[in-house]
């Protein structure tokens, strides 16, 4: 993997990541395909939205005992018929999500299988082996994600252990002679001194890119913005920066303007299945009765398959009837919206209109976002 910074405008970055499997223009948004699928869509449909890279979850694929089946296909790319780059999440956030089922130790995480209740152990080394078998283009270290709020002492203890896990992940990754990329994950809660230490130590270890974890876990948006503004200037300019699990369109813009290159989140696909659709002027809640007789396009500025072929009234009908096609068409649109947003951000830097774009975005959506 090779990252090239093409342009920097007041902290916002325009870049390019070269993988063996293709090029990713940044800023970039990665749809979440937890089990090797972006829910309801084929990989061809995902690609048609402008998606360059997908995130899959190594932890969940491992829990489903799919590792050996995937190896029979060669790798995860062949298994799911996606031949662009794939990034895999190690499972740190999922471990955080099932905290009532786990016991975290220096060695790793002991937990009960959330499906069958069997005892399972996951170490940093095991996580590297799982992701190696998947053939991930970007591998994530195993870390611990702390909740919000958390006391300083607890945040420090967790962050220091995550650093030791990062060292072990780094060592095992290179023992496997993995030629793909390994990203470190910055932790430390809302405490700038802990974030500083995490950044410093991860840079000393040396990673191909740096992710910012432990955000969007319930903290006020202002806290997240302050942490991003504090961290990003400390990171190497020649390495990509990835904000994990964030978020809504305005979150992407705020992350980008502070120096983030890569994003992932379930929001566009999950919200699509719930009938919450992102449009140029904000959000359309398509199940609302006012759309029953609305024969206009969902978004006249959108070029996706859904907007080019179906009315709001039809999408309302599908949603009210709980038809699978509704979820599919909604997902196509929301993903295309996110990819158009990323393309607009790239264009704004290329043309020197970043500040104008941000102002226009908020002017259009001020009364509609939630």
UniProtKB/Swiss-Prot annotation:
The active site is at residues 89, 264. Zn(2+) binds at residues 302, 304, 307, 333. It comes from Baumannia cicadellinicola subsp. Homalodisca coagulata. GO terms for cellular component: cytosol. Substrate binds at residues 89-93, 143, 187, 214. Binds 1 zinc ion per subunit. GO terms for biological process: queuosine biosynthetic process; tRNA wobble guanine modification; tRNA-guanine transglycosylation. Residues 245-251, 269-273 are annotated as: RNA binding. It is an enzyme of class 2 (transferase). Homodimer. Within each dimer, one monomer is responsible for RNA recognition and catalysis, while the other monomer binds to the replacement base PreQ1. Its cofactor is Zn(2+). Its EC number is 2.4.2.29. It comes from the Bacteria. It catalyses: 7-aminomethyl-7-carbaguanine + guanosine(34) in tRNA = 7-aminomethyl-7-carbaguanosine(34) in tRNA + guanine. The keyword Metal-binding applies. The keyword Phosphoprotein does not apply. PANTHER family: QUEUINE TRNA-RIBOSYLTRANSFERASE. This is Queuine tRNA-ribosyltransferase. Belongs to the queuine tRNA-ribosyltransferase family. Keywords: Glycosyltransferase, Metal-binding, Queuosine biosynthesis, Transferase, tRNA processing, Zinc.
């Amino acid at each position: 993997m090779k990252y090239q910074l093409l342009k920097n405008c007041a902290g916002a970055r325009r870049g390019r990541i070269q993988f063996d499997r293709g090029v990713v223009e940044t800023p970039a948004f990665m749809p979440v395909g937890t089990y090797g699928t972006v829910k309801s869509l084929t990989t061809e449909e995902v690609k048609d939205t402008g998606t360059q890279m997908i995130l899959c979850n190594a932890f969940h694929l491992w829990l489903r005992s799919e590792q050996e089946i995937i190896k029979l296909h060669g790798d995860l790319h062949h298994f799911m018929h996606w031949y662009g780059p794939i990034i895999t999440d190690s499972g740190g956030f999922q471990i955080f999500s099932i905290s009532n089922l786990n016991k975290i130790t220096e060695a790793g995480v002991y937990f009960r299988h959330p499906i069958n209740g069997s005892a399972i152990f996951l170490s940093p080394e095991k996580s590297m082996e799982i992701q190696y078998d998947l053939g991930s283009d970007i591998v994530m270290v195993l870390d611990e994600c702390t909740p919000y709020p958390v006391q300083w002492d607890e945040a420090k203890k967790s962050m220091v252990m995550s650093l030791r896990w990062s060292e072990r992940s780094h060592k095992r990754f290179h023992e496997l002679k993995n030629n793909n990329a390994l990203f470190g994950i910055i932790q430390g809660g809302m405490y700038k001194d802990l974030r500083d230490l995490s950044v410093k130590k991860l840079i000393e270890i040396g990673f191909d890119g740096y992710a910012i974890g432990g955000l969007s876990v319930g903290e006020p948006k202002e806290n997240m913005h302050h942490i991003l503004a504090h961290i990003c200037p400390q990171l190497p300019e020649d390495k990509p920066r990835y904000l994990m699990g964030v978020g809504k369109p305005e979150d992407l813009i705020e992350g980008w303007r502070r120096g983030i290159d890569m994003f992932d989140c379930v929001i566009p696909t999950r919200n699509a299945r719930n009938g919450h659709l992102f449009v140029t002027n904000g959000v359309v809640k398509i199940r609302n009765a006012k759309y029953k007789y609305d024969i206009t396009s969902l978004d006249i500025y959108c070029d996706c398959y859904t907007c080019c072929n179906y009315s709001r009234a039809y999408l309302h009908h599908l949603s009210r009837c709980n038809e699978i096609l509704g979820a599919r068409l909604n997902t196509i649109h929301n993903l295309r919206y996110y990819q158009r947003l990323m393309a607009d951000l790239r264009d704004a830097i290329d043309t020197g209109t970043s500040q104008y774009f941000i102002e226009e975005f908020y002017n259009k959506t001020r009364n509609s976002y939630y």
